[in-house]
Swiss-Prot record:
CDD domains for the chain: R-PTP-N (cd14609)
PROSITE patterns per record: TYR_PHOSPHATASE_1, TYR_PHOSPHATASE_2, TYR_PHOSPHATASE_PTP
Species whose genome carries this gene: Homo sapiens (Human)
Name of this protein: Receptor-type tyrosine-protein phosphatase-like N
Secretion signal span: 1-34
Stated role: Plays a role in vesicle-mediated secretory processes. Required for normal accumulation of secretory vesicles in hippocampus, pituitary and pancreatic islets. Required for the accumulation of normal levels of insulin-containing vesicles and preventing their degradation. Plays a role in insulin secretion in response to glucose stimuli. Required for normal accumulation of the neurotransmitters norepinephrine, dopamine and serotonin in the brain.
Membrane topology qualifier: Single-pass type I membrane protein
Domain notes: The RESP18 homology domain is sufficient for targeting proICA512 to secretory granules.
Length: 979
């Protein structure tokens, strides 16, 4: 069987096909074409237009005509298991029903299955159709025993033997017979049911566990509602096997050896049922309820005709030689009774053909009196079955459980649609369907009341209320309980009670409860027995399944569901308390989270306010501020006109790269004022290209040679300035004015304040002048961040030195540590000793730095000046900026604003050493390069500035950062030069 699949998917080459045809010729007359195709129930295209699909009990077989009787297959569980294996191999090879190899293998397997010959049809006289009284009906029933095989493929079983005598048998119907006869009438009067759900190869024939899942003893019944099936064809109808299976036949006709069922002449009740069923199916009744039943096109009637046993079409009433009696010949009482029965089904007498009317009258005489008039009795199951047919059709789309358990065909009274009603509640009728298991021998039938109490009822007598089904239930602690866990629990329970797992039917799960019913079993165990045993072996079941069994019992399904709220209600107080506590905890947690979020937001706002205070357009202050600004502008305008009359001042000896290569040496209005310029374009430098490339190559080599850089830094650390005394800074009155005790100004290089103007009557401030080349004019003033008690000294230094630019390289607070005190007003104006500082504007240039403008006024002399503060924010205390680009842009802004006036630039950080020294070193080197100096020695320049203030450029990283910044600025200048 394991052959390579050819591209066409037909399973072999032409040579193999010819060889198989020769093998068929050697074994069968007629060659390959004479072999009937198997599998037409799954693929209708196998049969030609001259052939029909005949039910053979398994797959269906194509045959020309339907008159030829075919042997019946005795299908058992081992046979199905073997066929499953064969089909698996065929499907694994990619073969289909159309392949010759598949047909050959299936035909060989079919030859191995045992066969049963159907009885030869005998001529029947008209007496078999004549209506008889209820008394002799039993006599007719025992005389006319021969029956055809059941129309369902799953029950090709030997027909039961008949009693010894025909006319001498029992003359009255037993209670069991009286209860089993109404389904015959039900099958005739109710409209044809829709085709069964489609079947797939995988679940139907390729799953060995279906026998255990659905409990079919002969392994021939598959689920009618299994989910996930692939449609390959309709199933045969299963109404007749439920009525004429081996158990039902023995119950009705008895088990009497000695006579074959084909020995007695005349029509049997089974034959009447089949013939009348064919007549009814041949002509659809225009009943109102027929429109509710969906039918597939071209399958509603053809499937029933094809699924019925062979020969029934030709063995109808027409073959008996005589026409049935007309309605006029029938007794009036019988017609009235038949009309009353038909009225309950929505059918009128005039809608029936004479053949149908005669057959129904014959069957009606077999019914006990009052059976058709009592819609709620035990015997009359027509109303319940009708509800089961209408319920699932109308409510199928509203509620459908994931898995459904089909009723077993061997059960005598199981309705084909009862499982659907049990699993899918119908919105039309909430009354449970009737599928009760009747006892075989007793005359009294048990009728279940809605309260679960048993009430004995004589068969055939009307009852006051309809019967209700009983279910066994097992309540567990798992909610919801999965269907797989429930089935596993029942399998283990079946082992403990020595039953087959197939004895459990109508299995369903309702929350944590498992409900089920049991079919007739060899142990004769009832639902009460099984649930009682489940309670006895509770510990074993819990150990094997891992579930905790809370309760077991027997009752209606509503009772099993009613147990659930009681269990929940017992724990509801504790659960409500727990839920209340959880809710309170959640609300409290939410409130705490909101409070924390508000605090964090407020703290962030406060930090932003400290960092970027008084944001807004220029002049966004009070009325006093506006008046003061107008006064300052008028004063500055007057001073500007006076300076223009005197002539331009001398150019400064200290200039930046940007100021050196600007368009023109524009004079500032005052030597103590600055004119802000926000041009971002890099200045065009007149640097020699060869010199610039030489300097750039030197700097890059300097940075790549790590050993050289390390040795150079070690030499800088060992350098000692001479002289290096700091006695004044360490004096008793001045030591409190130092922010850091290790970074103090030298005695020979420090800024001295005027004592008469100082509030502390001291000339000391922690600040050092940094001279570039002219000792009389320092280019920078390096100082620490002002303390709260040295702010007045700081503004005195700004006023006396004539500074117009302040470079601040530290935030006020960093990592919770104060780096510098705010020495300018938060908004408006503030007075520090005799110096009034007015914040004019604050402009956030980018995320790395911002610019502030101030008016500085000496209240003693009433003089005013303008100055600009450049505040760089992205330089950590012990490290370096992430990139040199922001600092170089910041430096360009500072030099654009400075305009080269004859005043130093005040540079400060926190301690006035690390960041301050790095900025001064970068700016000084670049200024020298802009002046045309071709020899650049950064280490020597650093030693030069350290001679004037100790500790400038505190770390090796800061020194390397200065080298990198210089190299990048040189590269930028070279790119800006014209090529």
């Amino acid at each position: 069987m394991r052959r390579p699949r050819r591209p066409g998917g037909l399973g072999g080459s032409g040579g193999l096909r010819l060889l198989l045809c020769l093998l068929l010729l050697s074994s069968r007359p007629g060659g390959c074409s004479a072999v009937s195709a198997h599998g037409c129930l799954f693929d209708r295209r196998l049969c030609s237009h001259l052939e029909v699909c005949i039910q053979d009990g398994l797959f269906g077989q194509c045959q020309v005509g339907v008159g030829q009787a075919r042997p019946l297959l005795q299908v058992t569980s081992p046979v199905l298991q073997r066929l499953q294996g064969v089909l698996r191999q065929l499907m694994s090879q990619g073969l289909s029903w159309h392949d010759d190899l598949t047909q050959y293998v299936i035909s060989q397997e079919m030859e191995r299955i045992p066969r049963l010959r159907p009885p030869e049809p005998r001529p029947r006289d008209r007496s078999g159709l004549a209506p008889k009284r209820p008394g002799p009906a039993g006599e007719l029933l025992l005389q006319d025993i021969p029956t055809g095989s059941a129309p369902a493929a799953q029950h090709r079983l030997p027909q039961p033997p008949v009693g010894k005598g025909g006319a001498g048998a029992s003359s009255s119907l037993s209670p069991l017979q009286a209860e089993l006869l109404p389904p015959l009438l039900e099958h005739l009067l109710l409209p044809p049911q829709p085709p069964h759900p489609s079947l797939s190869y995988e679940p139907a024939l390729l799953q060995p566990y279906l026998f255990h899942q659905f409990g079919s003893r002969d392994g021939s019944r598959v689920s009618e509602g299994s989910p996930g099936m692939v449609s390959v064809g309709p199933l045969p109808k299963a109404e007749a096997p439920a009525l004429f299976s081996r158990t039902a036949s023995k119950g009705i006709f008895g088990d009497h050896p000695g006579h074959s069922y084909g020995d007695l002449p005349g029509p049997s009740p089974a034959q009447l049922f089949q013939d009348s069923g064919l007549l009814y199916l041949a002509q659809e009744l225009p009943a109102p309820s027929r429109a509710r039943v969906p039918r597939l096109p071209e399958q509603g009637s053809s499937s029933r005709a094809e699924d019925s046993p062979e020969g029934y079409e030709k063995e109808g009433l027409g073959d008996r030689g005589e026409k049935p009696a007309s309605p006029a010949v029938q007794p009036d009482a019988a017609l009235q009774r038949l009309a009353a029965v038909l009225a309950g089904y929505g059918v009128e007498l005039r809608q029936l053909t004479p053949e149908q009317l005669s057959t129904l009258l014959t069957l009606l005489q077999l019914l006990p009196k009052g059976a058709g008039r009592n819609p709620g009795g035990v015997v009359n199951v027509g109303a319940d079955i009708k509800k089961t047919m209408e319920g699932p059709v109308e409510g199928r789309d509203t509620a459908e459980l994931p898995a459904r358990t089909s009723p077993m065909p061997g059960h005598p009274t199981a309705s084909p649609t009862s499982s659907e009603v049990q699993q899918v509640p119908s919105p039309v009728s909430s009354e449970p369907p009737k599928a009760a298991r009747p006892p075989v021998t007793p005359v009294l039938l048990e009728k279940k009341s809605p309260l679960g109490q048993s009430q004995p009822t004589v068969a055939g007598q009307p009852s006051a209320r309809p019967a209700a089904e009983e279910y066994g239930y097992i309540v567990t602690d798992q909610k919801p309980l999965s269907l797989a866990a429930g089935v596993k629990l029942l399998e283990i329970l079946a082992e403990h009670v020595h039953m087959s797992s197939g004895s459990f039917i109508n299995i369903s799960v309702v929350g944590p409860a498992l409900t089920f019913r049991i079919r007739h079993n060899e142990q004769n165990l009832s639902l009460a027995d099984v649930t009682q045993q489940a309670g006895l072996v509770k510990s074993e079941l819990e150990a094997q399944t891992g579930l905790q069994i809370l309760q077991t019992g027997v009752g209606q399904r509503e009772e099993a569901a009613a147990v659930l709220p009681q269990t929940a209600h017992s724990t509801s107080p504790m659960r409500s308390v727990l839920l209340t506590l959880v809710a309170l905890a959640g609300v409290a947690g939410l409130l705490v989270a909101l409070a924390v979020a508000l605090c964090v937001r407020q703290h962030a706002r406060q930090q932003d306010k400290e960092r970027l205070a008084a944001l807004g357009p220029e002049g966004a202050h009070g009325d006093t501020t506006f008046e003061y600004q107008d006064l300052c502008r008028q004063h500055m305008a007057t001073k500007s006109l006076f300076n223009r009359a005197e002539g331009p001042p001398e150019p400064s000896r200290v200039s930046s790269v940007s100021s050196q290569f600007s368009d023109a040496a524009q004079a500032s209005p005052s030597s103590h004022s600055s004119t802000p310029s926000w041009c971002e374009e890099p200045a065009q430098a007149n640097m020699d290209i060869s010199t610039g490339h030489m300097i750039l190559a030197y700097m890059e080599d300097h940075l790549r040679n790590r050993d050289r850089l390390a040795k150079e830094w070690q030499a800088l650390c060992a350098y000692q300035a001479e002289p290096n005394t700091c006695a004044t800074a360490q004096g008793e009155g001045n030591i409190k004015k130092n922010r850091h005790p290790d970074f103090l100004p030298y005695d020979h290089a420090r800024i001295k304040l005027k004592v008469e103007s100082s509030p502390s009557r001291s000339d000391y401030i922690n600040a050092s002048p940094i001279i570039e080349h002219d000792p009389r004019m320092p280019a920078y003033i390096a100082t620490q961040g002002p303390l709260s008690h040295t702010i007045a000294d700081f503004w005195q230094m700004v006023w006396e030195s004539g500074c117009t630019v302040i470079v601040m390289l530290t935030p006020l607070v960093e990592d919770g540590v104060k780096q510098c005190d705010r020495y300018w007003p938060d908004e408006g104006a503030s007075l520090y000793h005799v110096y009034e500082v007015n914040l004019v504007s604050e402009h956030i240039w980018c995320e790395d730095f911002l610019v502030r403008s101030f008016y500085l006024k000496n209240v003693q002399t009433q003089e005013t000046r303008t100055l600009t503060q450049f505040h760089f924010l992205s330089w950590p205390a012990e490290g370096t900026p992430a990139s040199t680009r922001p600092l170089l842009d910041f430096r360009r802004k500072v030099n654009k604003c400075y305009r080269g006036r004859s005043c130093p630039i005040i540079v400060h950080c926190s301690d006035g050493a690390g960041r301050t020294g790095t900025y001064i070193l970068i700016d000084m080197v670049l200024n020298r390069m802009a002046k045309g100096v071709k020899e650049i020695d950064i280490a020597a320049t650093l030693e030069h500035v350290r001679d004037q203030r100790p500790g400038l450029v505190r770390s090796k990283d800061q020194f390397e950062f200065a080298l990198t910044a210089v190299a990048e600025e040189v590269n930028a200048i070279l790119k800006a030069l014209p090529q």
